[in-house]
A protein has these predicted regions:
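All-alpha RGS (Regulator of G-protein Signaling) helical domain and cognate RGS-like helical scaffolds
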Residues: 1-135
């Protein structure tokens, strides 16, 4: 997460977007991948650590709802998803991952060309912050 490069805008040295292209298409795809990765990470830890299942289920559902708003969960490489082996470290690890996702969603909301997308991403960041409070 967090490695966006600013593409040249129309008239700034690069080919401009076609008149029908949505300028936020690439951003939405990147955000959807980040949310899907977070969802998979939470799900892997929920399955590996049954005593935490109830606590992690609401976070997993939040990511699924957020992904649905953007078109649905996408596949993420299984090699990038691993459950924390020690149960006592799960919540701290997920807390750090969720913090990074929250910060990225805030940055993405600023990058969005569409006001509606900016508002949606900011709302998602707030939702993640609320869930993090319970980790």
């Amino acid at each position: 997460m967090g490695r966006r490069s600013q593409a040249p805008r129309a008239g700034q040295g690069g080919p401009g977007p076609s008149p029908t292209a949505d300028p936020d298409t690439e951003l939405v795809a990147l955000v959807l991948t980040e949310i899907s990765r977070a969802h998979a990470q939470v799900k892997a830890n929920r399955r590996a650590h049954r005593p935490l299942a109830g606590q992690l289920r609401s976070l997993e559902r939040l990511h699924a709802r957020h992904a649905a708003e953007l078109g649905g969960l996408v596949e993420v490489p299984a090699l990038t998803i691993a459950a924390e082996p020690k149960q006592e470290r799960v919540l701290a690890r997920l807390g750090r991952l969720e913090n990074r996702l929250q910060q990225q969603l805030v940055r993405d909301s600023v990058e969005a060309d569409s006001g509606a997308l900016a508002l949606l991403l900011a709302s998602m960041a707030a939702g993640v912050a609320q869930e993090r409070a319970f980790l």
